[in-house]
Amino acid sequence: PFHIGHLASTVIGHSLKMIHAFSGYNCVGINHLGDWGTQFGKQILAYKLWGDKETVERGGVDELVRLYVKFHAEAENDDSLNTRAREEFTKLEHGDEENTALWRWFVKISLDECNRTYDKLGITFDSYAGESFYTDKMPEQVEKLKESGLLKVDNGASIVDLSEYNMPPCLILKSDGSTLYPTRDIAAAVYRDRTYHFDKCIYVTASQQCLHFAQWFKVVELMGYDFYDKLVHVPYGMVSIDGAKLATRTGNVILIRDLIDAAVEKVAAVIDEKNPDLENREQVAQDVGVGAIVFHYLLNSRIKDTNFIMDDALSFDGSTGPYAQYTYARTCSLIEKAGDIKNANVTITEPSEAALMKTLSRFEEVVDAALRDYEPSTITRYIIDVCVSFNRFYQDCKILGAENDDVRASRVSLVKATNTVLANALPLICMKTPKKI
């Protein structure tokens, strides 16, 4: 299921795609689906033991999760279930008709659920080629490893020895011949190089996978592929709920759809109270509710561990998405009320005007820093700086009621500049820009 543990890779990845595109790169967003592996052996066995078609069709991904959690609970006391699950996955790898049909069904149910959430987040992908896409592309890479003399057999498993590089061996094939993550990742990287001829191939995953990426990046280099130095791993910190680690197998998750629904409901209540006649109320509630979640996620450095507390995510006080979107909407309102204003030289009469100009002038360097460091939070924190500077200017200075036309035109120009910066900056962190809230 799409839970908040998946939100980090989704929004960090999409933000980095937007930042690179804004900086002139031609970007391809890939959703590397985890649609292959021993977890499907567990899912298939759980379904065969405790599931039925009608219940899964009715319950969808929730029923699949229930079965998956039940498998792990039962396996705690019966290790033979793990052996049987591995056997089911081996059958799947060898093209077993029944298991292949079940696998396709489970993947479709999961992807349909994910796509509904992606739609709400406003995030799209150019490719959904997941792990299963590379099953027929792995033998070529395994053969290349054998021919190069890199592949060794250790206790029945096929490995690449990386002790020379102070790393554990990289496992390529299990003793039963089934593949592992590195096998699939190497095949995927080769395919992407041949298909896209990339300048960078960026992987956004949890920091627990740093060793995994270091290992197979090194294997790619040892295989002689010249794109090895274009592979970039962008790690992020662990996500927990009130200090408890997220895990689908235990059922300790908060589904993104539930979080979005709660946020949108809260925003809708605020709109009903403060601006009940607002046009497109439902869409604005959606944009601001989703924005509150995304902004909360991207406010801190990606490498920091996140203890996700629901009330904090949905708070509308302080450095939040709603505050940023409301500030943008305020600039839109002022520009609309100002009407046609002649171009004006900016006349500085108040310290807050100078401070706002200085903050706005940093936009280009902030984007460059975010690009260099693969760090969306650089943009997020800058947006807060802009909003704070603008609202201080708004409090200190009469804009539409300025003392003369030149000062009025000058201040409206500052409003327009703020509007332009926010209109460009907010989408870089997956945020919508409603003109009225």
Question: Which ranges hold each PLM region?
Answer:
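Non-catalytic interaction-recognition regions
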Residues: 1-437
